[in-house]
Every structure is written in structure tokens, then in C-alpha cells.
Amino acid sequence: MEIYNGRPEKSDGRLLREVRTYDFLDDLGIEYKRTDHEPANNMEACNEIDAVLGVLICKNLFLCNRQKTNFYLLMMPGDKKFKTKELSAQINSARLSFADPEDMLKYLDIEPGAVSIMGLMNDKDHAVQLLIDEDVLAGEELGCHPCVCTSSLKMKTADVINKFLPATGHGYRTVHLVGED
């Protein structure tokens, strides 16, 4: 795997949602490193990418309440266990579960395996609430997918918080996840 500065030179063979991500970041003046790879749609596959980029790829979970009236995008360190009960208590929500792939596509224009904070640029109605574990915020840089699971990005956390999120119209809520039983 090679590391590149910024977007690919050519967009041939790339999905429109990926190209739109690069356009969005470039328009905001956000610098990023990129690597292309085989599909990485689980955290185990991301371990090698972590080593290449020199950053921990975030675990991104798309969740909803039982009634499917509230949707959440949770960003947490990839090596931390997710405990539904722990998060539900912090955000004062009844039972949370993984949202359907159809809702993922509808709100974030992302398919399973490629869930990423970058998808918030597609949530024009602000239906998705962003939850970020404090350990992600403590890192100087973060890693994520550009709305596809065949590329990964590394960028400054401050750029995501101070440039990307305001441009999408999304705020975030900090959560403290321990991930232990």
C-alpha cells in the first residue's frame, strides 16, 4: 500500500460518493493522506491500514432507536469494545441497535463496511446525530473511509471538528465509552 497526498489524480473507476468526498474536503482546504486497498469492511481488515497510515482507523457504527426515529453515528477507537447498554445510558435513549443498510444509504449515502463521518456531508436534513468517544477527540489525527471501503484517509482531528462538521451543519456530542463488562 502506498500513501498519497490528497485525492487521486484520476477518478476513473471510483464511485461518485468517493469523488464527492474529495471535492468536499478540497473545497474546505482540509489536507489529508490517502491509501487505496482491498475492501476493508471490518476492524480486523483495518489493522494493516492503521500501520500504513500511522493512525488508528475509527470504528464507526450507525445506530438507531427501536422506533427508528433517532439515528446516531458513533465514532470510537477501533480497539475499544462497543456496549449498547453503556452508550444508551449516556445518551438517555432506550434500546439502540444497528440501523438497516437502507437507512445508511438513505441518510449517509454509504453502504455497510464504509460507514464514516464523511457520510455526514450527505445528511442534508441533519437526521443523524454524531457521537464521538473522547479518546477519538484526544487524538491529533484520525482515520476514516471516504464513503467507500477501498480507500482510507488520515487527517487532523481539529480539521474534522472545526472545518468539516460546521460545513455539514452537524455538531457532535462527546461520550465516554469504557467498553468493559
Q: At which residue positions do the language-model features occur?
A:
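Extended, low-hydrophobicity, polar/charged segments
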Residues: 1-181
